[in-house]
Amino acid sequence: PSSGAVTAAADPGEALGKITSKFISPYTAGQSFGNIYLKNSTSKTVDISEELQSPVGFRMEFSSEPEVLIMHTHATESYMLEERDYFTAADATRSTSDAVNMNHIGEKVAEVLRANGIAVVHDMTQHDAEAYTGSYDRSAATVSANLKKYPSIKVVLDLHRDSVGTEAEKIKAVQKIGDKNAAQIMLVMGCEDGSIQNHPN
């Protein structure tokens, strides 16, 4: 068709769509303070300045006991390993290979924390490998088991790879720092609000 629409499965190597580098502006977040931008989707009122001055509620001991747990509800979320501006049918968005999925990213984060004196447990269980449905229930069980085994853990990080775009275009969220591109990072934090209960704020 003249529209260029893909009407049949593409061969590996045939472009299905484009990849666009984009800085997702934090100025649409609604609230900001310094370099912190907040999109508040709850009915709660948040004062970022006040929150930054409030006690955290725990203190890192920098001991040999694990204080951070890194895990992945969707461990098979994967990355492309090369820079290009298109994607094909051969470019998987999920992989059980720890060389290209979130377990690889989690280990890199763990290495940085360990290098700074913070003991880390990195649980590489692939909760979504067999089925996407139920992965949060399975990862919750993993977190509970680790907290029971390592009561010294103070912080749990569930690292994901975001997915922004459409079937025809994938957005690569980046910000240039100096002369290098860096991936943008978003923290998702829940709280008790509306139908969400038993969730400490």
What residue ranges belong to the model's regions?
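Catalytic-site microenvironment of enzymes
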Residues: 1-156, 161-201
